[in-house]
């Protein structure tokens, strides 16, 4: 194929709606355990969702440099779409075909790439668009993919867009509910139970969403009501691994640790190589030890041996988790009840990819805020996550200016900028400079007060600049909202 045709192909590639244009991973950095989780879902998910996972697996294989394996995954996806969505096969295949074009392009097989370009073009022409169309099923496909990659905010947008066209679609509604549930770990993005209840109403057989509703109600101190949904889901889907795993989390948080261990072990029967599950069981045994110690049972004559046995179980399962290739950062990141230093500080000292470390610092920051823990610690981990993001694009600049991390990451009109600066100076032992920064933050907050008290803390020029600054910055004013928009800053 001629060079001209290659150039024309390169103009088409960015127009294709597929994994290569969805910005799934920052700098194409994939967490190490994602491929295992995707493969696990291919094995145990219902057939109609497997094509979505095969497409994602194809992209992961490409990022690993294994394009031949990527092509095999795309063939599997194409076959499944033909089987499960025969009436919509062409539209449902657009994402797969787009992925084909990109993989063949990277392999230098331009004639094969052109074959799939023509397939996309023929389908999209029916909708008066050459290479991409707006279609709710495609938004849903992207939504599930973004959700699997941990990009919950983007997934939420995709499902909301799909629901605009088909507001009563059960799959779209379930996707939105799941995305919003995962966003609920961020204290600024908590949501009501309505979206979960609506998803259950539209899809009453979706037992996984029922368990998520139970977990949400538990978080709202409505544990008894939540347990009814969990019990119903377990009764109707006693072997569904995502239901069992989430139900186990419910009982772990309830303190019914024996029930939690039983459910986690049932999941292990289907996924014996899942290190995360071994870790969860180990955490449950640790919690059982603490339960006995807190109630004074450890002093009883026969209980000392039991406690030692529980400690050994905890150690055995933890070691088993590591043997199975557990990524410590992902294991610890969703255990809000294990925020103690012994469980949470260890992974940050591990040698792991920046993409995983950055994600975990941000999750830890959110958990500290959500649970009302140390504000200084929340800011510290928020800065660590932002710093990792900055280093990945400009490593030398950060290396040369280690003391000015926050200034490089946040503009002065960012919400609570001076409060953040104050905390940094405080942590560095410069209390005088910290006090000056806190004064500036107070001045910002009080700038528009009728009494003019803001002038005590700000210079005349800073007061004059204030109106423009406030217009550009977010409306956040609480110190606890300091890092609420960190995803946008990364």
From Swiss-Prot:
TPR repeats lie at residues 51-84, 94-127, 136-169, 172-206, 207-240, 241-274, 415-448, 450-481. Residues 386-409, 467-490 are annotated as: Disordered. It comes from the Eukaryota. Residues 474-490 have a biased composition (Polar residues). GO terms for cellular component: cytoplasm; cytosol; mitochondrion. Keywords: Antiviral defense, Cytoplasm, Immunity, Innate immunity, Mitochondrion, Phosphoprotein, Repeat, TPR repeat. Residues 391-400 have a biased composition (Basic and acidic residues). The modification Phosphoserine is found at residues 203, 478. Transmembrane segments: none annotated. It is found in: Cytoplasm; Mitochondrion. The keyword DNA damage does not apply. PROSITE patterns: TPR, TPR_REGION. GO terms for biological process: defense response to virus; innate immune response; negative regulation of apoptotic process; negative regulation of cell population proliferation; response to virus. Belongs to the IFIT family. IFN-induced antiviral protein which acts as an inhibitor of cellular as well as viral processes, cell migration, proliferation, signaling, and viral replication. Enhances MAVS-mediated host antiviral responses by serving as an adapter bridging TBK1 to MAVS which leads to the activation of TBK1 and phosphorylation of IRF3 and phosphorylated IRF3 translocates into nucleus to promote antiviral gene transcription. Exhibits an antiproliferative activity via the up-regulation of cell cycle negative regulators CDKN1A/p21 and CDKN1B/p27. Component of an interferon-dependent multiprotein complex, at least composed of IFIT1, IFIT2 and IFIT3. Interacts with IFIT1 and IFIT2. Interacts (via N-terminus) with MAVS, TBK1, TRAF6 and RIGI. Interacts with COPS5. This is Interferon-induced protein with tetratricopeptide repeats 3.
